[in-house]
C-alpha cells in the first residue's frame, strides 16, 4: 500500500521495451508486445524525470489521453489532442491506505466520484475499446475494496507515550483543522487549501488548471467520466496522516526528506541525496524520514549522471520545498511532541 518513493523514471524506457519481446515466438504474443512497445515509445518523452523517486503519473495520463478517441477509446498513432509538455511536474505517490479516508484521489482535488474508474485509466496504455474497459470494470470494485481495506504498518520502535499525548494536544490545536483527527472517532475535513495560503510549489496545481480544457475534459466526457470526475482545484488537499511516518519524502513533490524538516522550514535542504535503500539504517527514526546527506550544489553543478539522478534539487521548476510553514510557529518542544504523536497514527 505504500507508493514507491524510489521509482526510477530517469531513463528512456523505449529501448528496453523493444528488447523485451525478442524471445517471443507466438504470433499473438508478438502482436501484443509490439502494441505495448509502440505505446511506450509514444509516451516515453513525457515520463522521463531528472531524479529518482519523482513520478510522472499526471503527464503519462495526459499523453495517453492525447492518443485516445474519447468516445471509442481507440488508439491513434497521431495525437488527437495537443500533447503535454515533456518536462513533467513531479508527484510523490500517496500511500494507498489513505484512500478510504478522503473523497479525492489526487493532490489538486481532482479524482472524485467512482475512484475505480479513475484508477482504471492506468489501463489506457493498452485497452483499445469500451468493451475491454468494461471487462476490467466488472472486477475493479474488488480491487477498490481491497485498497480500502489496507491499513498502515505500526511504528516499529518504542514510543514515549507521555510525549505523544502532549503532541496530540498540540496537533489537535494546530494541525487537525486541515489534516483531521484520529483515534476512536476520527474525522477528516477534506479541504482544498488555496495556493496563497499553503505556499507550496504551485507547478502541479498550475499545470492541472492550464491543461484542464484538454485532458480533464477528455476524461469527464469519456466512458471513464460516466462515474468518476476530474475537477482539479487551485490548491492542494492536506492528506490524512495515518501511517505518515512511513511515507517520506513529504509535500506533493517529495521535496522534503523528513517530517522534522516539514515542521521546521529552516531545516529543509536546498540540495540533498539519500541512499534509496529501505533498511532500518536508511531511515531516520528521530526526524521521521530518510537519512539525508546535504550537498552544496544542484544538478547544474553535478557532472556525474549517477550522482545527479540521486540528487534532489529544489531549485528545479516544480521541485520547490517552500510553503507549509505552519510548524515554524511551534516551539522546539512542541514540534518534538508532535513528531512523537505522529508515530502513533
Task: List each language-model region with its residue ranges.
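Periplasmic c-type cytochrome electron-transfer domains
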Residues: 1-345
Amino acid at each position: 500500500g505504500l507508493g514507491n518513493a524510489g521509482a526510477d523514471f530517469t531513463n528512456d524506457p523505449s529501448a528496453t521495451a523493444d528488447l523485451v519481446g525478442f524471445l517471443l515466438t507466438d504470433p499473438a504474443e508478438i502482436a501484443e508486445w509490439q502494441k505495448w512497445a509502440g505505446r511506450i515509445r509514444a509516451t516515453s518523452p513525457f515520463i522521463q524525470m531528472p531524479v529518482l523517486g519523482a513520478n510522472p503519473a499526471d503527464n503519462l495520463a495526459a499523453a495517453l489521453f492525447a492518443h485516445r478517441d474519447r468516445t471509442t477509446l481507440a488508439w491513434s498513432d497521431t495525437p488527437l489532442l495537443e500533447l503535454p509538455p515533456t518536462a513533467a511536474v513531479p508527484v510523490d505517490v500517496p500511500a494507498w491506505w489513505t484512500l478510504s479516508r478522503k473523497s479525492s484521489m489526487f493532490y489538486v482535488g481532482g479524482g472524485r466520484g467512482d475512484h475505480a474508474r479513475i484508477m482504471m485509466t492506468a489501463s489506457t496504455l493498452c485497452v483499445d475499446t469500451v468493451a475491454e474497459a468494461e471487462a476490467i470494470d466488472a472486477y475493479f470494485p474488488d480491487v477498490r475494496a481491497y485498497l480500502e481495506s489496507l491499513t498502515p504498518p505500526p511504528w516499529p520502535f518504542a514510543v514515549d507515550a507521555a510525549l505523544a499525548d502532549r503532541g496530540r494536544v498540540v496537533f489537535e490545536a494546530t494541525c487537525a483543522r486541515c489534516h483531521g483527527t484520529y483515534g476512536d472517532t476520527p474525522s477528516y475535513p477534506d479541504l482544498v487549501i488555496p495556493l496563497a495560503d499553503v505556499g507550496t510549489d504551485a507547478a502541479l496545481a498550475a499545470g492541472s488548471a492550464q491543461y484542464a480544457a484538454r485532458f480533464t475534459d477528455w476524461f469527464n466526457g469519456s466512458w471513464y467520466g460516466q462515474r468518476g470526475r476530474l475537477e482539479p482545484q487551485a490548491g492542494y488537499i492536506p492528506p490524512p496522516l495515518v501511517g505518515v511516518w512511513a511515507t517520506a519524502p513529504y509535500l506533493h513533490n517529495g521535496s522534503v526528506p523528513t517530517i522534522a524538516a516539514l515542521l521546521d522550514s529552516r531545516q529543509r535542504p536546498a540540495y540533498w541525496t539519500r541512499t534509496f535503500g529501505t533498511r532500518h539504517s536508511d531511515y531516520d527514526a528521530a526526524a521521521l524520514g530518510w537519512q539525508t546527506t546535504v550537498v552544496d550544489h544542484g544538478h547544474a553543478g553535478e557532472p556525474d549522471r549517477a550522482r545527479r539522478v540521486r540528487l534532489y534539487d529544489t531549485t528545479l521548476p516544480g521541485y520547490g520545498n517552500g510553503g507549509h510553514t505552519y510548524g515554524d510557529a511551534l516551539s522546539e518542544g512542541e514540534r518534538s511532541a508532535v513528531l512523537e504523536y505522529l508515530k502513533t497514527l
